[in-house]
Design a protein with these regions (language model features):
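Charged, solvent-exposed interaction patches on well-folded alpha/beta domains
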Residues: 1-142
């Protein structure tokens, strides 16, 4: 599974292609990145996930595929897609990763993986990958 998503009190696992794998428990869901801000519509095991905002599914698929490719699925705890102009990932409680808009998401995830390699274990803060002014990441310690 690539991620977990909560729907009306129940939890679903989905793969990186956003296919719903199975319903699961809240405890089991904690083992995967949680997609927050996504409202599933009529989830059915074995079918493609659909959401009230279909673009969220497209964005989730891009992010989950990139996270899988760059070995970040095990360390990202939350993928917040409630605002597609302000996407936020959480690396446990150590890092808030601001991705900004949906532009260049796969590149931003690749860039993130490089940044994480260079941060010390004791560091925590915000990793800004919004690229609002230039294509440069900024680290803002807490």
């Amino acid at each position: 599974a690539g991620a977990a998503v909560s729907e009306s009190g129940s939890w679903w696992l989905l793969d990186s292609n956003c296919k719903l794998l199975e319903e699961t428990t809240a405890e089991e869901a904690k083992k995967y990145p949680v997609l927050s801000g996504v409202v599933l519509t009529a989830p059915v095991s074995g079918c493609a996930a659909s959401a009230a905002d279909p673009e969220q599914i497209t964005v989730a698929q891009t992010l989950l595929t990139a996270m899988e490719q760059w070995d970040l699925v095990d360390v990202i705890t939350t993928v917040d897609l409630s605002k597609l102009y302000g996407i936020v990932l959480w690396y446990g409680d150590r890092f808030e990763i601001d991705l900004g808009s949906t532009d260049n998401l796969a590149y931003k995830i690749q860039y993130l993986q490089e940044i994480l390699k260079n941060l010390n274990d004791g560091q925590s803060g915000v990793i800004d990958l919004t690229f609002e002014t230039e294509t440069v990441a900024r680290f803002l310690p807490w």
